[in-house]
Structures are given as C-alpha cells and as structure tokens.
From Swiss-Prot:
Example GO biological process: 'de novo' UMP biosynthetic process
Gene that this sequence comes from: pyrD
Membrane topology recorded in Swiss-Prot or TrEMBL: Peripheral membrane protein
Pathway(s) per entry: Pyrimidine metabolism; UMP biosynthesis via de novo pathway; orotate from (S)-dihydroorotate (quinone route): step 1/1
Cofactor needs: FMN
Name of the protein this chain belongs to: Dihydroorotate dehydrogenase (quinone)
Record-listed E.C. numbers: 1.3.5.2
Length: 369
C-alpha cells in the first residue's frame, strides 16, 4: 500500500511533498482521536527496548534524525508516531533561507536522497519558542550549526548563541560540524578548531543551570585518524557522546544513472549507500571509546536486522530519516518490533546489555545439563 502511495508522492517535488506530509502528521497528532489511532498503529512500548543514555530515559532507541523538523514545529508529533526521540534542526543562531532550490533530490534506485538544503531555518530564538510550548513525551535533542554568514573565527560564539537559547529547553544538544552544505563547516572537525568550539558550547550549556548532555556529529568522510582524534577529544572534554554519521559527499557504487547524479549537483548523500561506512565508523568509535561515550548511529538503517547490527556494534541509540521516507509513517514500528524480537532471540534481557556485544566475543551458552 505504502509502495503505491510512495510512487504517487514521488510525482511531487521532494521539498513540496515533505511540507505536505509533515503538515498532515501535525494535524493527525493534534486531535485526540487521530492521535490515539496513530499511537496504536506506531508505538511499540516494550520494556526490553527501554534504556537510560547520558542520564536521559528512552522508551525506544530509534529517533528521528536532524533535518526533518528543522524548526521544532513537530516536537509533539514524534512520540505518537512511534519515535523514541527526535532531534530538531539543524538550527542556527540567525535565521537563514538556505541554498537556492532545487536542493533536495531522490535516488529511488538507491533508496537514497541528496540534499544541499544549507541549514534553512527560522533561527534559534524561534526554535526556543517552539520548545517552550512543547508537551512532548519523548526526549528532544537540539542540533545546532554555524550561521552561513559567520566567519570561522566567530563560529564558537555563533554556536554559543544557539546553545544558550536551546540548551535549557532540550534534553540534549548536538553540535553539527559535519554538514557538507555550509562552506567551510567541515573544517571545524579538525581538532585544533573543534576543541575551542566544543569547550565554548559546554561552558554555555553549563551556565544554563541544568545538566544537558552535549554530543558532536561527525561526517563519514573523515579519515580513520581524524575519527580517532575526534573520539579522543570528546572523551577529553567530557562530551556525552558522538552522533555518527552525517551525509557523505561520495557518489561511488550508486545504481542511479551517473548522468542523473551529476545533474543533481553537490550535496550530502543519505540512505542505503551510506550504511556500510556508517557501520564502519561506529565500530571504530566503539573500539576507541568503549562505554565512555554514548554512540548514536545514523546512516542507512532500513531494517530491524540493520538496527540490531548497529546495537551490537556499539550504538546505544539509533536514528533514521531517509529510511523513514522510503519505509513509511509506521516504519518505526517495524524497526522496534523486529529489534525486540532479535534481542530476545539471542537471550538478551535489555537493549543496554546488547550494546557493543560484538566486541566482547561470543555470548556464553546457558548450561542446560
């Protein structure tokens, strides 16, 4: 059924259908009868999936990745639609229009998207207003980025402005230095640039008077050495975790016609083609930091089996966006139900018990004698 609907929706320009679908979801979540129906169809409340990560309780591990709800307009939508949490943004200190359209493209043959949105959003002050009014029952993270017109020398102060506005209202803050669509942003992933930026954000959030976990989001295109350096820095500074990974600028291995891909132009590629590298980065990070940091894995997750693989590889939480687009409004139910079944199949009593299990070797078999 959804496959047919998806074909119809794909007749509409991607950004337009995004706004229409998002509006429909907000309407469904606004009224008690439709909200109750959606919740019954989407929510999986299974104790085996409950966990506490960086001091925040999560009733389910799959969250909505940043990029869908840029302005925190749907914070009360995501719980009823089965998400364990959601990340708003990316939000910048100043409102900005983003890059010129067209800036969002579909690659159905690859179950992927290319975007060069450019952090289009209404600004941190507007997002803060939305967060103040929320009644959300799931954790909400605030993903913050650099305002495009701000020079690199002013990046730390720019991030601090967003952190000061959103930190007191969010359950966690994610520092995004990995989008390929803001010129020079990825240069901030270099440790010598990242250290003062993260310190400033940490100090700003601490000044807000409540403990708010701070994470950093990294790109899949970093070298292994740079991944290690960021991981070491995160531990050094006392970050709560790392979100891995953002979109990639690579285009190799795609099934979509190369001429069509070239015509789409620059931007970050998300979806199935990112899965292998995202898993690779996750494994490297866990080997580096173990349980000293929480790892949120995002990139190419489509099935319960892939979700389970990420947990075993070291992910305490998961995120999706492109999988949601191709999987439909109740995709979260499929992932959560399947993940719970896989955990029980292998003898785990909780999600937390399974995090990073592949790095600890085979599980001992129960004595049946």
């Amino acid at each position: 059924m959804y496959a047919l609907l998806l074909r119809v929706m794909f007749l509409v320009p991607p950004e337009r259908i995004h706004h229409l679908a998002f509006a429909a979801m907000r309407v469904a979540a606004r009224f008690a009868p439709t909200r109750a129906l959606v919740r019954r169809l989407a929510v999986v409340d299974d104790p085996i999936l409950h966990s506490t990560v960086f001091g925040v309780p999560f009733r389910a591990p799959l969250g909505l990745a940043a990029g869908f709800d840029k302005n925190a307009e749907g914070v009360d939508v995501w719980g009823p639609f089965g998400w364990g949490f959601a990340e708003i943004g990316t939000v910048t200190a100043q409102a900005q229009p983003g890059n010129p359209a067209p800036r969002l493209f579909r690659l159905p043959a690859d179950r992927a998207l290319i975007n060069r949105m450019g952090f289009n959003n209404h600004g941190a002050a507007r997002a803060a207003e939305q967060l103040r009014a929320r009644t959300a029952t799931v954790p909400i993270g605030a993903n913050i980025g650099k305002t495009k017109v701000v020079e690199p020398a002013g990046a730390a102060a720019d991030y601090a402005t967003s952190a000061a506005l959103l930190g007191p209202l969010a359950d966690f803050v994610v520092v995004n230095v990995s989008s390929p669509n803001t010129p020079g942003l990825r240069d901030l992933q270099a440790v010598e640039s990242l250290r003062p930026l993260l310190r400033t954000v940490l100090e700003t959030v601490a000044d807000g008077g409540r403990r708010v976990p701070v994470l950093v989001k990294i790109a899949p295109d970093l070298s292994d050495e740079d991944i290690d350096a960021v991981a070491d820095l995160a531990v050094e500074l006392g970050l709560a975790g790392i979100v891995a990974t953002n979109t990639t600028i690579r285009r190799d291995g795609l099934h979509t016609d190369p001429e069509d891909v070239a015509a789409m132009g620059a931007g970050g590629l998300s979806g199935a083609p990112v899965a292998d590298r995202s898993l690779e980065v996750l494994r490297r990070l866990y080997r580096r930091v173990g349980d000293r940091l929480a790892l949120i894995s995002v990139g190419g997750i489509e099935t319960p089996e892939q979700a389970y693989q990420r947990v075993l590889a070291g992910a305490s939480l998961l995120q999706g966006y492109t999988g949601f687009i191709y999987g439909g409004p109740f995709w979260t139910r499929k992932i959560h139900r399947g993940l719970a079944e896989l955990l029980r199949r292998d003898g785990y009593t909780s999600l937390t018990e399974a995090v990073g299990a592949e790095h600890r070797g085979p599980r001992p078999q129960a004595d049946t004698a």
